């Protein structure tokens, strides 16, 4: 048992999916997993363990943003020995050729968060995904015929920005999309020597205003979960 997770030792699998929304964690468990048990309800941040294609997998809600996901990733690794962590969530496209419903696999994540500046004063640490997980997720997506993009994303500390100038400039440097957690996940995975990946679906485009319908969002979300689960069980 840790501060924010009430699971007993052995109740959490070595491979875990990390949606921000705890209700998405519940949906994933009920829709994709078998023999499901709920191991956490502290602060309503639901966590479940079950099996997928005969392999043990867990799903844990993390909340939104760098501080929240950092809490859960730290505890999952340090207290429960989790080895493979895959964030599953949505993002907003920045590049013109990135379309809604595309799947983005984050190779790395730049950020406006000060998280790493606290650890590396005066330096910019560049956290990266685990290549084995990335390759497995990419292969799983392309085998399903999905449009999968791999590249850099922006992990932002602010959802409602007063100006999009910096986001536009990052787009000029090839950043694909913006979200709010990947930098923290990849940094902590590097710190503790475990494997991490972010698999994201594009729910809207920051500059064109295009966005998915609720039905499209659910279909794409399901496809993303299958990609993440297929990668997780191969580790």
Curated annotation (Swiss-Prot):
GO CC terms of this entry: cytosol
Main enzyme class: transferase
Binding site for a purine D-ribonucleoside: 4, 162, 179-181, 203-204
GO molecular function terms listed in the Swiss-Prot or TrEMBL record: purine-nucleoside phosphorylase activity
Entry keyword annotation includes Protein transport: no
Site (Important for catalytic activity): 217
Residues holding phosphate: 20, 24, 43, 87-90
Keywords: Glycosyltransferase, Transferase
InterPro entries: DeoD-type, Nucleoside_phosphorylase_CS, Nucleoside_phosphorylase_d, Nucleoside_phosphorylase_sf
Active site: residue positions: 204 (proton donor)
EC number annotated for this UniProt entry: 2.4.2.1
Catalytic activity field: a purine D-ribonucleoside + phosphate = a purine nucleobase + alpha-D-ribose 1-phosphate; a purine 2'-deoxy-D-ribonucleoside + phosphate = a purine nucleobase + 2-deoxy-alpha-D-ribose 1-phosphate
PROSITE patterns: PNP_UDP_1
GO biological process entries: purine nucleoside catabolic process
Function (record text): Catalyzes the reversible phosphorolytic breakdown of the N-glycosidic bond in the beta-(deoxy)ribonucleoside molecules, with the formation of the corresponding free purine bases and pentose-1-phosphate.
Cited NCBIfam families: deoD, PRK05819.1, PRK13374.1
Quaternary data: Homohexamer; trimer of homodimers.
UniProt cross-references to HAMAP family, sorted A to Z: Pur_nucleosid_phosp
Family: Belongs to the PNP/UDP phosphorylase family.
Entry protein name: Purine nucleoside phosphorylase DeoD-type
Protein's organism: Bacillus cereus
Gene: deoD
């Amino acid at each position: 048992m840790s501060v924010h997770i009430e699971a007993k030792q052995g109740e959490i699998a070595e491979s875990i999916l990390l949606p921000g929304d705890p209700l998405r964690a519940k949906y994933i468990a009920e829709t994709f997993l078998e023999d499901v048990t709920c191991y956490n309800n502290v602060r309503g941040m639901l966590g479940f363990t079950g099996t997928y294609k005969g392999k043990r997998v867990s799903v844990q809600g993390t909340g939104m943003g760098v501080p929240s996901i950092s809490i859960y990733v730290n505890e999952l690794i340090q207290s429960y020995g989790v080895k493979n962590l895959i964030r599953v969530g949505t993002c907003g496209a920045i590049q013109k050729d990135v379309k809604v419903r595309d799947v983005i696999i984050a190779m790395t994540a730049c950020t406006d968060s000060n998280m790493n500046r606290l650890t590396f004063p005066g330096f910019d640490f560049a956290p990266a995904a685990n290549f084995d997980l990335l390759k497995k997720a990419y292969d799983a997506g392309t085998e399903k015929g999905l449009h999968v993009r791999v590249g850099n994303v922006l992990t932002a500390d602010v959802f409602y920005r007063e100006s999009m100038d910096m986001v536009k400039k990052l787009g000029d440097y090839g950043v694909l999309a913006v979200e709010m957690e990947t930098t923290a996940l990849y940094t902590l995975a590097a710190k503790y020597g475990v494997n991490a990946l972010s698999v994201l679906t594009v729910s809207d485009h920051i500059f064109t205003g295009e966005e998915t319908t609720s039905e499209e969002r659910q279909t794409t979300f399901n496809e993303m979960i299958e990609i993440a689960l297929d990668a997780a069980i191969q580790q």
